[in-house]
């Protein structure tokens, strides 16, 4: 029998509904309210007493009035999952917004579900090969790990995201879910068309809750994307989950918390900040079936890393990839800062002794080169000691060899994209560190894949 209540109060995105005493809907249940031709979905957030439940709307509440009928759906919001979602664009409710017709999905999953049990989780740390040299060498990603992607506007966050989607699709046969949380509509639009042009759209599901949507939708859209990713993982796939931007998830939660009348905590954030973040992040993990590796763009308010929002996010991250404007300004892409980026699995017990030693030596040389920059600027390279001059020669070659042509940027750069296996990456940097290529011109190292391409390019330069 259907359970119908009446709307008794509407305050912005908050809708209070009265039900019969014995039929109160559960917390997180979806409620459907018909307003004219539209159907508005809200989610139960609180039981207030007097048989009234307080719900948060996932859509605009324009047109809602007291006395309207509200139907308890009897379960949380459910979204389509499985193969039919690939290549499609969804809103937070799992409704397609790409004007390509209905999604013919056989399965739907609730967006609220517990994290995998300890017995199901995979505990063996394993490296996830991205084919991007600077990431694989300096700050490797863990399979089933969580990675923070830090960077300002225009330094290449989106290009790295697209290349990762491209590489996991082509090299690993894996799938991706991109979740835009509180993003600018224009950026989501650009990403959708760029993905269509680069051909990676068919291995990707996109979910957007844009900036102009109510806080309920922006708070829950990350769960919609995660639910789609979890289904692929449980089918034995390795999935990439992109969340852009994880700060907007916290921000939307703060708005919802204030609307529900909770007393704010530090810096005005919700008192449940750590719980909300934990309930999302704990579901992003590897199981014995497959893995979800999550790359999350992190906005840092006023560049204050101690702000509760980024500080709470950091506790969950396994690796950080920091994009630097100063590196992009000298024309080296991807503009990843090798000295600021970190990874928990850059450990000889996980990546092996050789990888660890090469990565440490590369960092050491780049750090020394960074220290020498002021001396070089004032006195020039000729005034340096023989040892420091060698550091400069190798550091400049390493810096350029950390650049790489991307498949998704071929139309802009004119270079064919390269996927570099980790063994090739380690071999290349090891040989540069040993001084084998001190006599090759620096420009031969720029935008190359493996070290063999560098040698070939240098030979061609000599011939011409």
Swiss-Prot record:
GO molecular function annotation: ATP binding; ATP hydrolysis activity; proton-transporting ATP synthase activity, rotational mechanism
Keywords from the named record: ATP synthesis, ATP-binding, Cell membrane, CF(1), Hydrogen ion transport, Ion transport, Membrane, Nucleotide-binding, Translocase, Transport
Disulfide bridge partners, by residue number: none
InterPro entries: AAA+_ATPase (IPR003593), ATP-synt_VA_C (IPR055190), ATP_synth_F1_bsu (IPR005722), ATPase_a/bsu_AS (IPR020003), ATPase_alpha/beta_chains (IPR050053), ATPase_F1/V1/A1_a/bsu_N (IPR004100), ATPase_F1/V1/A1_a/bsu_N_sf (IPR036121), ATPase_F1/V1/A1_a/bsu_nucl-bd (IPR000194)
Extent of the signal sequence: none
Superkingdom assignment: Bacteria
The UniProt record lists the keyword ATP-binding: yes
EC number: 7.1.2.2
Similarity comment: Belongs to the ATPase alpha/beta chains family.
PANTHER family referenced in this protein's UniProt entry, alphabetically: ATP SYNTHASE, ATP SYNTHASE SUBUNIT BETA, MITOCHONDRIAL
Subunit structure: F-type ATPases have 2 components, CF(1) - the catalytic core - and CF(0) - the membrane proton channel. CF(1) has five subunits: alpha(3), beta(3), gamma(1), delta(1), epsilon(1). CF(0) has three main subunits: a(1), b(2) and c(9-12). The alpha and beta chains form an alternating ring which encloses part of the gamma chain. CF(1) is attached to CF(0) by a central stalk formed by the gamma and epsilon chains, while a peripheral stalk is formed by the delta and b chains.
HAMAP family registered for this protein in UniProt: ATP_synth_beta_bact
Name listed for the protein in its UniProt record: ATP synthase subunit beta
Source organism of this protein record: Clostridium kluyveri (strain ATCC 8527 / DSM 555 / NBRC 12016 / NCIMB 10680 / K1)
Gene that this polypeptide is encoded by: atpD
């Amino acid at each position: 029998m259907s359970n119908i209540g009446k709307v008794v109060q509407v305050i912005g995105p908050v809708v209070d509904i009265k039900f019969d005493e014995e039929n109160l809907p559960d917390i997180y249940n979806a409620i459907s309210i018909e307003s004219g031709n539209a159907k508005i979905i809200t989610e139960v957030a609180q039981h207030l007493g007097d048989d009234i439940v307080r719900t948060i709307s996932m859509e605009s509440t324009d047109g809602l009035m007291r006395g309207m009928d509200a139907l308890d759906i009897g379960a949380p919001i459910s979204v389509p999952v499985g193969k039919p979602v690939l290549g499609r664009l969804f809103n937070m409710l799992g409704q397609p917004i790409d004007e390509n017709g209905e999604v013919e999905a056989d399965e739907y999953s609730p967006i609220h579900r517990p994290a995998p049990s300890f017995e199901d989780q995979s505990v063996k740390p394993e490296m996830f090969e991205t084919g991007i040299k600077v990431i694989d060498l300096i700050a490797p990603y863990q399979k089933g790990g969580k990675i923070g992607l830090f960077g300002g506007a225009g330094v290449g966050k989106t290009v790295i995201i697209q290349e990762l989607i491209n590489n996991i699709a082509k090299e690993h046969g894996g799938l991706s879910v991109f979740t835009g949380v509180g993003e600018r509509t224009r950026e989501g639009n650009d990403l959708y068309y760029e993905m269509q042009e680069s051909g990676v759209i068919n291995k990707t599901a996109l979910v957007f809750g844009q900036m102009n949507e109510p806080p309920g939708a922006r708070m829950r859209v990350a769960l919609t994307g995660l639910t789609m990713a979890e289904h692929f993982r449980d089918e034995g796939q390795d999935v990439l989950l992109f969340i852009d931007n994880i700060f907007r998830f916290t921000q939307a939660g703060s708005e919802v918390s204030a609307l529900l009348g909770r007393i704010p905590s530090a810096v005005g954030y919700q008192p449940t900040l750590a719980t909300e973040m934990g309930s999302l992040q704990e579901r992003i993990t590897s199981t014995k079936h497959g893995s979800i590796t999550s790359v999350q763009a992190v906005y840092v308010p006023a560049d204050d890393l101690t702000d509760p929002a980024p500080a709470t996010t950091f506790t969950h991250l396994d690796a950080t990839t920091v994009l630097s404007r100063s590196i992009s300004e000298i024309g080296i892409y991807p503009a990843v800062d090798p000295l600021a980026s970190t990874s928990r699995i850059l450990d000889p017990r996980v990546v092996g002794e050789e990888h660890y030693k090469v990565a440490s030596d590369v960092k050491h040389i780049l750090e020394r080169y960074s220290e020498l920059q002021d001396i070089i600027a004032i006195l020039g390279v000729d005034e340096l000691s023989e040892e420091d001059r060698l550091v400069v020669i190798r550091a400049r070659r390493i810096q350029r060899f950390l650049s790489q042509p991307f498949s998704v940027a071929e139309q802009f750069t004119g270079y064919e994209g390269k996927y570099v296996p980790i063994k090739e990456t380690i071999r290349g940097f090891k040989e540069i560190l040993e001084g084998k290529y001190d006599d090759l011109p620096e420009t031969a190292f720029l935008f190359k894949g493996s070290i063999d391409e560098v040698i070939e390019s240098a030979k061609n330069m000599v011939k011409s």
